[in-house]
Amino acid sequence: MNKLETNNNQYWLDRWQNDDVGFCQESPNEFLVKHFSKLNINDSSVCLIPMCGCSIDMLFFLSKGVKVIGIELSEKAVLSFFSQNTINYEVIHGNDYKLYKGDDIEIYVADIFNLPKIANNLPVFDIWYDRGAYIALPNDLRTNYAKMMLEVCSNNTQILLLVMEHDKKSQTPPYSVTQAELIKNFSAKIKFELIDSKQRDNIPDYRKAEGMTEQYYTTYLRKKQY
């Protein structure tokens, strides 16, 4: 598979349609759990989760009293989330999206790059949590994604960004993201702090075939600006 094949929405729709979703976790992400207390949470906190899939992390936020806004391309993923977790919902149709609305959670079925178009329909969010969106995109789209998120985030948006860093350039997602890249793409408005870096114990065989010998989980935080 070459880079161009991961550049389009059909790639991800096919992954969901074929249940090729090994990136889905059965428990909340360990780095979210570890660093959640670093976020400033209150009764009105709302978290935006781009490319949310059917992530169990959404339940973690809900369990902490945080309302959730998800953006997801695959309607199958959204339906799976609500059915697997027996959450009631209503469906609302918009011009650029289809909204699945439950108690304290809204998931918009839409292309992530349509986010600026639907931003006015979203509740105001004070947290942006990104576990798999940024690293799911090849380099050119990551640059565009960063520009878009700079548009929709405010000075008070708290950000917990989970990425991966490899010793070889990835040909498939998740892609390697360095601190230097984040500075380049976000420094105009957002300053990230590296708060965690953990080496992966077992590198997948397909990564070894690419020549990879080291892989790290890295976590970045941007706190609320007072």
Curated annotation (Swiss-Prot):
It catalyses: S-adenosyl-L-methionine + a thiopurine = S-adenosyl-L-homocysteine + a thiopurine S-methylether. One of its GO terms (molecular function) is thiopurine S-methyltransferase activity. GO terms for cellular component: cytoplasm. The keyword Transport does not apply. This is Thiopurine S-methyltransferase. Its EC number is 2.1.1.67. Gene3D superfamilies: Vaccinia Virus protein VP39. It comes from Francisella tularensis subsp. tularensis (strain SCHU S4 / Schu 4). Pfam families: TPMT.
